[in-house]
Amino acid sequence: GCKKDRKPCSYHADCCNCCLSGICAPSTNWILPGCSTSTFT
């Protein structure tokens, strides 16, 4: 899944976005738009 490279999501727009709920969704996901791009921890 996402974050297998363990780098901040903001570095990989083509990988995933980190939602506040802790869900890591694909940046191309139109179901969960507007997710934050902060570091996923």
Curated annotation (Swiss-Prot):
InterPro entries: Conotoxin-I_CS, Toxin_19
Alphabetic keyword roster: Disulfide bond, Hydroxylation, Ion channel impairing toxin, Neurotoxin, Secreted, Toxin, Voltage-gated sodium channel impairing toxin
Location within or outside the cell: Secreted
Pfam families: Toxin_19
One GO MF term: sodium channel regulator activity
Modified how: Position 41 corresponds to a L-threonine, and not a D-threonine as firstly supposed.
Disulfide bonds: 2-16, 9-19, 15-24, 18-35
Coiled coil start-end: none
Modification type 4-hydroxyproline: residues: 8, 26
Tissues expressing this chain: Expressed by the venom duct.
GO CC entries: extracellular region
Functional description taken from the UniProt entry: Iota-conotoxins bind to voltage-gated sodium channels (Nav) and act as agonists by shifting the voltage-dependence of activation to more hyperpolarized levels. Both natural (L-Thr form) and synthetic (D-Thr form) peptides cause paralysis and death following intracranial injection and grooming and hypersensitivity upon intraperitoneal injection into mice. The L-Thr form of the peptide is 7-fold more potent than the D-Thr form. Both natural peptide (L-Thr form) and synthetic peptide (D-Thr form) are active on nerve, and on muscle.
Domain text: The cysteine framework is XI (C-C-CC-CC-C-C).
Family statement: Belongs to the conotoxin I1 superfamily.
Name by which UniProt lists this protein: Iota-conotoxin-like r11d
